């Protein structure tokens, strides 16, 4: 076997392989003999068909079959011999396939990029320094009360924060428009869930009132025939309800799994959860800054086959997030909506893998178990979760990858200029959310 390799780009190789004619012809002859023993032809007893007849009748079909197998076998031998690291499947085409001649085929494939990591030593990374105060706990408890509030009818004018029960019908000029009517609709004023200007005109209304509300649909409204149109809604108010917050008592705190210790135990539990959330937010913010710096310092080429694989994974995730069901055909989602994000994720993954390799990082069984135990604390039956993860090789490998990723990020932070920045609990969470939002916005812009 003769092999030559041509680099057509940083990550593409064109491999030409020649297989001696004698080897091919011998393999074809052997397969024809096997065929002669097993095939049935009218006028011949099984196993007694002359080889010349078998060759005439099945020769091309057998040769195609043998050549296909030999190309697959010799492709594997060739990339092993040339120490190539393929990313995805190759495109293989025979260029010479004739009896008595050496078989020649060309395999075009993408390979993983080879590169040396550039340092991020000049990058400044902000690390939020925050703590959960008593005031933060008070605010969180108020938020929990609001989330568990009940609506109670009130005999007064509606105010922001109240809920009104209404019938409405929308008109363009004198004609009602499709989808613009509802009965018994419950609307929280100030929620901004309706067209701009609609909710504001219901402030001050009482049960039994009938109003005409004039609004203008936004220019970017999802229903194109309504975008930018002026409309009038005829509205009847049936009920005004105020929000009644529950008292922080034993009944309330039991909703959150606190059976003993009263309000003090509840506050301690809330604070513990907030501290965990804060820790995760700080970790994620620092991590994302480090990964962004790593990618900017190392703009490596990415195999298209890996981008395509990641794109399909992102499409499946999107289908799950939007509740499209297991039977949904993700091919209906355009690849271009996910391609840029997929490329970034693959690029970061390759860079992190190189950080792990260069620094000879590994994750011990104890480290994997500790991470599983940490994750399991989020569930009601942690013991079952731990057992499931540790006995499932696929899940265990995912945890190992997570541990290695964190170790790689720690190595990056050793290079970078990490600056501690004092901020409040809310500011720390907002900083993390803003960074995530900026990344999502950038993805939307590049996909637009």
Curated annotation (Swiss-Prot):
Residue ranges of domain PPIase FKBP-type in the record: 161-246
- InterPro entries cross-referenced by the UniProt entry: PPIase_dom_sf, PPIase_FKBP_dom, Trig_fac, Trigger_fac_C, Trigger_fac_C_sf, Trigger_fac_ribosome-bd_bac, Trigger_fac_ribosome-bd_sf, Trigger_fact/SurA_dom_sf
Q: Name one GO cellular component term.
A: cytoplasm
Q: Is Cell division found in the keyword set?
A: yes
Write out the entry's keywords from A to Z.
Answer: Cell cycle, Cell division, Chaperone, Cytoplasm, Isomerase, Rotamase
Q: What is known of its domains?
A: Consists of 3 domains; the N-terminus binds the ribosome, the middle domain has PPIase activity, while the C-terminus has intrinsic chaperone activity on its own.
Similarity comment: family membership = Belongs to the FKBP-type PPIase family. Tig subfamily.
Name of the molecule in the record:
Trigger factor
* Originating organism: Chromohalobacter salexigens (strain ATCC BAA-138 / DSM 3043 / CIP 106854 / NCIMB 13768 / 1H11)
